[in-house]
Amino acid sequence: MASPDWGYDDKNGPEQWSKLYPIANGNNQSPVDIKTSETKHDTSLKPISVSYNPATAKEIINVGHSFHVNFEDNDNRSVLKGGPFSDSYRLFQFHFHWGSTNEHGSEHTVDGVKYSAELHIAHWNSAKYSNLAEAASKADGLAVIGVLMKVGEANPKLQKVLDALQAIKTKGKRAPFTNFDPSTLLPSSLDFWTYPGSLTHPPLYESVTWIICKESISVSSEQLAQFRSLLSNVEGDNAVPMQHNNRPTQPLKGRTVRASF
């Protein structure tokens, strides 16, 4: 399998992405630092509503720079509504970002504070587009819920995901991952910040409406170590653990971050 043209090392990492993906220097890039004193409370924001059918969970895949849990997205059994959205957005995936130590790893930060990891639950606009490929590059095409993860107590709700990692140790491996509702990973409060942004790795499309939960969830040091023990190499090659896969924060460039609270 050819190595991708981007990654998280010095030679192909975030500082280099703009050479192949000029949008990396665009005006709506993610992640960002959320400066709470500069956010705007918006009374028009509705509560976030998620309805995920566990039967849509499909498989878990080691993609070399991370792992993805993918969902069947051929109908509206699993959707996100409310918040800033007038359309319904269909669940297709969740994944995580983490760092080489517990001191950093999240992509978004709050008042400069870095968290240990970040969960992304990704959806596409099924009201306007016919599939993910069509929606992925459109300004209103994607909606991603970001949940900051704070090191502390072990999070039992992560256990099914962590147990599945054994089967996908190396790049390209995939395994069935069924009967799972990712809303179980959300914090108890769904207060959120929202802003227009981008995918946080290539192709970096500026097509994401971000929903960042105000409340974090817990993850233990041991659980984070399990993320880092995944390998970015194909089976049989020298072991290269996935130490980190988080992009640094990008300038807001005049964007407003709205708060639901």
Swiss-Prot record:
Gene for this chain: CA1
Binding residues annotated for substrate, in chain numbering = 200-201
Q: Which UniProt keywords apply?
A: Acetylation, Cytoplasm, Lyase, Metal-binding, Zinc
EC class = lyase
| Gene3D superfamilies xrefs | Alpha carbonic anhydrase
This enzyme catalyses: hydrogencarbonate + H(+) = CO2 + H2O; urea = cyanamide + H2O
The residues that the entry says bind Zn(2+) are 95, 97, 120
Protein name as annotated: Carbonic anhydrase 1
Into which family does the record put it? Belongs to the alpha-carbonic anhydrase family.
What would you give as a GO molecular function for this chain, any one? cyanamide hydratase activity
The cofactor(s) it depends on are: Zn(2+)
Record InterPro entries: CA_dom, CA_dom_sf, Carbonic_anhydrase_a-class, Carbonic_anhydrase_a-class_CS
State the EC number(s): 4.2.1.1, 4.2.1.69
Function text: Catalyzes the reversible hydration of carbon dioxide. Can hydrate cyanamide to urea.
Tell me the classification of the organism that encodes this protein.
Answer: Eukaryota, Metazoa, Chordata, Craniata, Vertebrata
Region: Disordered; residue ranges are 1-40, 241-261
Q: Which residues carry this modification: N-acetylalanine?
A: 2
Which compartments is it annotated to reside in?
A: Cytoplasm
The cross-references to PROSITE patterns, in alphabetical order and at most eight, read: ALPHA_CA_1 (PS00162), ALPHA_CA_2 (PS51144)
- Catalytic residues at 65
Q: How is its activity regulated?
A: Inhibited by acetazolamide.
Alpha-carbonic anhydrase domain location, by residue?
Answer: 4-261
UniProt GO cellular component terms:
cytoplasm
